[in-house]
């Protein structure tokens, strides 16, 4: 999709960009694949904020996505490409030959009318899902499982892709979008191709109100808070932090401080750590 720019008719419009949604073929989602979505506003079951800067925004309905891609041997036809308010990628509605309908993440270059398949015998074609051990070296993939049958967990955001680098025993070596190179069980499934809507990261929100429509609340600097609210708070005027390193609101070091567990079980599967 292309990026649409506006003339600076107001301060909010100046610099603001939007996607032109030229790939979207319908604005009516499949009702049987919708579920109610209650707003959490970043709170947990105790009502405490666990994720800051969330709340408000336009009402949404959840689209039930098929991350498992376990409908083996039954061809499906792409009926529509749709917008999904709950993720950066677009989604595709698939009509299977047996009458079932499912949503999948829409890969790049997937068009209405194309046919897709799942299973070990599927062709290496955009939108097809098969075990990593059956995918040739060099192929770009997305929606990768970490455990067979659990459903895709990695590489699902707009414009992302991973590359199959090699095979070693029952494991397949994959370079992820972050630059991390790791081993994943060959029985885990992945979908061929890159995730579509790659222009998503180039969109400029342009004004605070548009961020609020998306459910994003303001981010306040710690240095302008009071000492009771943040370790950086207090002092006269633009006071320095007054500590050896920047701190989180809860007094933990941040900005360069390592937060990964030193003895993480998944370390043995990581060949090269992600780019900093």
UniProtKB/Swiss-Prot annotation:
Q: Does the keyword rRNA-binding apply?
A: yes
User: GO terms for molecular function, please?
Assistant: rRNA binding; structural constituent of ribosome; transferase activity
Q: What name goes with this protein?
A: Large ribosomal subunit protein uL2
Q: Which NCBIfam families match?
A: rplB_bact (TIGR01171)
Biased composition annotated in UniProt, kind: Basic residues: 258-276
Task: Identify the InterPro entries for this entry.
Answer: NA-bd_OB-fold (IPR012340), Rib_uL2_dom2 (IPR014722), Ribosomal_uL2 (IPR002171), Ribosomal_uL2_bac/org-type (IPR005880), Ribosomal_uL2_C (IPR022669), Ribosomal_uL2_CS (IPR022671), Ribosomal_uL2_dom3 (IPR014726), Ribosomal_uL2_RNA-bd_dom (IPR022666)
State what this protein does.
One of the primary rRNA binding proteins. Required for association of the 30S and 50S subunits to form the 70S ribosome, for tRNA binding and peptide bond formation. It has been suggested to have peptidyltransferase activity; this is somewhat controversial. Makes several contacts with the 16S rRNA in the 70S ribosome.
Renumbered residue ranges of the record's region Disordered: 224-276
Please provide the record's keywords in A-Z order.
Ribonucleoprotein, Ribosomal protein, RNA-binding, rRNA-binding
GO CC, sorted alphabetically, is: large ribosomal subunit
Q: Assembly and partners? A: Part of the 50S ribosomal subunit. Forms a bridge to the 30S subunit in the 70S ribosome.
Tell me which PANTHER family the record gives. Answer: LARGE RIBOSOMAL SUBUNIT PROTEIN UL2M (PTHR13691:SF5), RIBOSOMAL PROTEIN L2 (PTHR13691)
Gene behind this protein: rplB
One GO term under biological process is:
cytoplasmic translation
Query: Family, per the entry?
Result: Belongs to the universal ribosomal protein uL2 family.
């Amino acid at each position: 999709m292309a990026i649409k720019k506006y003339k600076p008719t107001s301060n909010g419009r100046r610099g603001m960009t939007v996607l032109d949604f030229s790939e979207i073929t319908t604005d009516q989602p499949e009702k049987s694949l919708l579920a109610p979505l209650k707003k959490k506003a970043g709170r947990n079951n105790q009502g405490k904020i666990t994720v800051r800067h969330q709340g408000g925004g336009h009402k949404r309905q959840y689209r039930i996505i098929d991350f498992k891609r376990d409908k083996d041997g039954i061809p499906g036809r792409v009926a529509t490409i749709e917008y999904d308010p709950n993720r950066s990628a677009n989604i595709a509605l698939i009509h299977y030959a047996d009458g079932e309908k499912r949503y999948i993440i829409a890969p790049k270059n997937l068009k209405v009318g194309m046919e897709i398949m799942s299973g070990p015998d599927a062709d290496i074609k955009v939108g097809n899902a098969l075990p990593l051990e059956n995918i040739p070296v060099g192929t770009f993939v997305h929606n990768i499982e970490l455990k067979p049958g659990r459903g895709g967990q990695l590489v699902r955001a707009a414009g992302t892709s991973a590359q199959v680098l090699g095979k070693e025993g029952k494991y397949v070596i994959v370079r992820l979008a972050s630059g991390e190179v790791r081993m994943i069980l060959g029985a885990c499934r992945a979908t061929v191709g890159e995730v579509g809507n790659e222009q998503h990261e180039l969109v400029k929100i342009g004004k605070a109100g548009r961020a609020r429509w998306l459910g994003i609340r303001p981010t306040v600097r710690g240095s302008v808070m009071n000492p009771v609210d943040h370790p950086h708070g207090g002092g006269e005027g633009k006071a320095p932090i007054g500590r050896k390193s920047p701190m989180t609101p809860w007094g933990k070091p941040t900005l360069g401080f390592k937060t990964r567990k030193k003895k993480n079980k998944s370390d043995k599967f990581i060949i090269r750590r992600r780019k900093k």
